[in-house]
């Protein structure tokens, strides 16, 4: 499930996020073509939902840092937003577009499959972000 995330005190904070406000806002987007996350971008494009993309980043890790000091908003997985809200003084609201539920997969090279440190990291990621 995806939400919209932005800094506390943003002009959208405390209001229901409408589709019109979503379209008018400046967006930061994690470029994720060919992944589950990329499907969200493709879905919105097919539905005719245009965004004012002001910045693209190669991964979600940068988004919290960017949002806390700008007026941009981002479409992010709800589980990711939950981890970013307090550390970056952000808020998350329901997404104005009815997005489909999308499965996100974790991949690794076969040669690392039995490596203890890789197993530990995969387990940590699974425990933190899976719906179990």
Residue map of PLM features:
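Short beta-strand-centered segments that line the small-molecule binding cleft or hinge
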Residues: 1-6, 13-16, 42, 91-93
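Bilobed periplasmic-binding protein/Venus flytrap-like ligand-binding cleft at the lobe interface
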Residues: 106, 117-131
């Amino acid at each position: 499930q995806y939400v919209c995330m932005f800094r506390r005190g943003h002009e959208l904070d405390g209001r229901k996020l409408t589709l019109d406000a979503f379209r008018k806002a400046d967006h930061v987007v994690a470029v994720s073509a060919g992944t589950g996350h990329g499907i969200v971008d493709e879905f919105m494009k097919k539905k005719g939902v245009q965004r004012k993309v002001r910045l693209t980043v190669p991964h979600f890790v940068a988004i919290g840092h960017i949002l806390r000091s700008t007026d941009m908003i981002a479409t992010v997985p709800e589980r990711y937003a939950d981890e970013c809200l307090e550390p970056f003084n952000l808020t998350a609201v329901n997404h104005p577009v009815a997005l489909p539920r999308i499965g996100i997969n974790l991949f690794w090279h076969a040669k690392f499959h039995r490596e203890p440190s890789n197993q530990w990291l995969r387990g940590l990621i699974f425990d933190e972000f899976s719906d179990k």
